[in-house]
A protein has these predicted regions:
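ABC ATPase NBD coupling module
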Residues: 42-44, 98-116, 137, 143-147, ...
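ABC ATPase nucleotide-binding domain "signature" region
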Residues: 64, 114, 178-183, 187
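The feature captures the beta-strand-to-loop junction immediately N-terminal to the Walker
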Residues: 66-68
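Helix-to-loop junction immediately C-terminal to a conserved catalytic motif
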Residues: 81
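Conserved ABC transporter NBD signature motif
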Residues: 89-100
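Conserved ABC ATPase "signature" region
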Residues: 100, 143-162, 214
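Short helical segment in ABC ATPase nucleotide-binding domains corresponding to the A-loop/adjacent helical element
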Residues: 128-137, 147, 151, 255
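Conserved signature/switch motifs of ABC ATPase nucleotide-binding domains
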Residues: 165-168, 186
C-alpha cells in the first residue's frame, strides 16, 4: 500500500523534550476511596456490588487490584474514570472530590485515562495519528506539536518504526504499547488499566510487563491496574489490593517490598514466591465464597 508521507517538523529537539517530560503537577495522582457503596438496580431487585470500600492509591506508584470474577473491581475503576456513579461514599483525586455527596458521578477528564481490555485504536488512522489524536481534539496541542510529541514518545517506547502503520498491521502486543503511549500523550495523573494484557499469550505478556515497567520508570505516573493474573499483580505492583467476593471491599493489602526497576529474574526469588503464595491463598478463599454464593442463588 502506497501512503503519502507524513509531515515532518523542524521544531528544536529541546522543545520536544519539554513536551514529553512529566510536569510537577502530573507527578501527583493520589486516589482516595472512602466508604464507597455501589448498588445496582432497584430496592426490590438490587445487586450490592461495592460495600464500604476504603483504600488509597498512592501517587506515583502501581496499585494492582485482584479478586474473584464479578466482585466489583471494574465497578470501582469505572467510578474513578467517571463512567459510573456511586451510591454513597466519596472518591478523591489529590484531595479534590471526584464523586461523593452532591455529585455521585465523576466528570471524565484527561487527568484519568483508561486503557481498556479490548483496545480502542482507530483502525483507519495510522499509529502516529492515533497517538496525536487526543491532545489535538482537546485543543491542548496544535497538530504540529502533537505529531512532534507523539514521535518522541513512540521513540521512547521503542515504536519509532511503526508510526506510518495502521493498527491492523501490527501485533496485538504492539497495539497495547501504542494504546499506553497514546494514553500518556494526555499527561494524565492516573492511568486506569482494566486487564490490558488478558488476551495476550504468556510470552508476549511477559514482554509487555517489562515494557510497562520501563514506561513507568520514565513517567512515574500513578497506575491503577486490574487483573486476574496473580503473578502479574506481584511482578508489577508496589501494592496489591485483594478484594472480597461481592460486595467488594479490601480483604488484604500487600506492600510488595521488591525494589524497582524489576525484571523477570525476581520471579524466581524466595520473596516473590512468598508474596504470591499469600495472594493465592487470600484470593482462593474469596473464590470459594463466590462459588458457594453462586450455588445458593440457583
Amino acid at each position: 500500500m502506497n501512503r503519502a508521507p507524513l509531515p515532518t517538523y523542524d521544531r528544536p529537539i529541546a522543545d520536544v523534550k519539554a513536551l514529553v517530560s512529566p510536569s510537577a503537577e502530573r507527578r501527583k495522582g493520589e486516589i482516595r476511596i472512602a466508604d464507597v457503596v455501589k448498588i445496582y438496580g432497584s430496592e426490590t431487585a438490587s445487586i450490592h456490588a461495592v460495600d464500604n470500600c476504603t483504600f488509597d492509591v498512592p501517587a506515583g506508584k502501581i496499585t494492582v487490584v485482584v479478586g474473584p470474577s464479578g466482585c466489583g473491581k471494574t465497578t470501582l475503576l469505572n467510578a474513578i474514570a467517571g463512567f459510573h456513579s456511586i451510591t454513597s461514599g466519596a472518591i478523591y483525586l489529590d484531595d479534590t472530590l471526584l464523586c461523593g455527596p452532591g455529585r455521585l458521578s465523576a466528570e471524565p477528564g484527561p487527568d484519568r485515562i483508561v486503557v481498556f481490555q479490548n483496545g480502542a485504536l482507530f483502525p483507519w488512522k495510522t499509529i502516529i495519528e492515533n497517538v496525536a489524536f487526543g491532545p489535538m481534539m482537546q485543543g491542548r496541542l496544535s497538530k504540529k506539536q502533537a505529531f512532534e510529541k507523539g514521535r518522541a514518545m513512540l521513540a521512547e517506547a521503542g515504536l519509532r518504526d511503526l508510526e506510518s502503520n495502521y493498527p491492523g498491521e501490527i501485533s496485538s502486543g504492539m497495539r497495547r504499547r501504542v494504546e499506553i503511549t497514546r494514553a500518556l500523550m494526555n499527561d494524565p495523573k492516573v492511568l486506569l488499566l482494566d486487564e490490558p494484557y488478558r488476551a495476550l499469550d504468556s510470552l508476549t505478556k511477559s514482554v509487555m510487563h517489562e515494557a510497562l515497567l520501563e514506561t513507568f520508570d520514565r513517567n512515574q505516573v500513578t497506575i491503577f491496574f486490574i487483573t486476574h493474573d496473580l503473578e502479574e499483580a506481584i511482578f508489577l505492583g508496589h501494592r496489591v489490593v485483594i478484594m472480597t467476593t461481592r460486595p467488594c471491599r479490601p480483604k488484604k493489602i500487600l506492600t510488595v517490598d521488591i525494589p524497582h526497576p524489576r525484571d523477570y529474574s525476581v520471579l524466581t526469588t524466595k520473596r516473590f514466591r512468598e508474596y504470591l503464595d499469600e495472594t493465592v491463598a487470600a484470593v482462593h478463599e474469596e473464590a470459594i465464597k463466590a462459588f458457594a454464593a453462586g450455588e445458593r442463588e440457583r
